[in-house]
């Protein structure tokens, strides 16, 4: 069995690596076209989630930009007592979405996707789309309203309905920043769609980088 281990380990390692797409370089964070060009998994996952849950891809991507800067294993920094003893992290937020354990469990239970991982691009995009759909159903937030969608994402559905964000001026500033980022991404998508559609048919294959009406 020991002799077989290396041959089994290599394909398994390759499978695990293939399931996690690479993080885009920092220089491309503010350009959605560059992120999509770096790794088409971002594009595919964002458009799939948009089609499934109704939140535009540019808003989904703006959420990831704010929450993790596209870092798959992002989590709150750990503080140290006396500079030596590691203390518990401030929350269980983890991965591209920075979803905490209870919210991620609710997503898995609701969708039946028990194998979903917060380090996986497709699962992460699907989670944000799903959560925004809950905001739409429970709090009546338009799936195009980046500002209020983000407030609900941060505060939770109950917190949003209680308007806890009104006591957090800093959070409203962050929500505004996410809104600006989504607008930037939206405009970029229009431009890179034009460039994409004008490329040769052999390269474009009729593919569009956004859902209607951006194509």
Which residue ranges define each predicted feature?
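Low-complexity, Gly/Ser/Thr/Pro-rich intrinsically disordered linker/tail segments
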Residues: 195-215
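C-terminal motif of bacterial Sec signal peptides marking the signal peptidase cleavage site
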Residues: 16-19
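Catalytic glycan-binding domains that act on GlcNAc-containing polysaccharides
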Residues: 21-196
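Bacterial N-terminal signal peptides that target proteins for export
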Residues: 1-8
